[in-house]
């Protein structure tokens, strides 16, 4: 008798406390790639799907890994217009490979960029550059990143712009940018003055301003000793 009463109580409780299922959100989530990268600006695929279903956003083109194909699929489910998806890629803004910069210490700890950064900024002379231990390689779900001569390099054709590497890099030198702008990126994030930069890296930006002066379109500016290019110009 006690078992029967308990069973009935659980049955009633399951009905009363049941959470309504958002079928549209589930359908949208099924159309998403499932990377849960957060590049869309929401907590993950489920968060983006819920926002679309509940009308919190009408932008169907926020999923960078899914691209135009996913945008069209979402538009079909929701009845919204398919959003424009600009092809994006992550870029490692550093040229401090083994030929351009020296090591200042013999690091023998865990091969982790995050761990190495905590020891005098890392083993390389330039404290702003890529350490090259591959934390970004480990988190990339698309095998788009490889270490080449001590620096991480990203294959733009394999990159899905999920931002996993951007969020992982302890140096903050990986930027996400439109694919067509990547070739015009200034590949250095050294904040030191020119004389110091020369000592640290042969390929580092020394802030000589030549690119600023010679660019007839005004597409290059200097912010905090870092040259910034504007490819759209």
Predicted features along the sequence, with ranges:
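Residue-level detector of conserved catalytic or cofactor/ligand-binding positions
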Residues: 226-232
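Ferredoxin-type iron-sulfur electron-transfer modules and their immediate structural context
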Residues: 1-214, 221
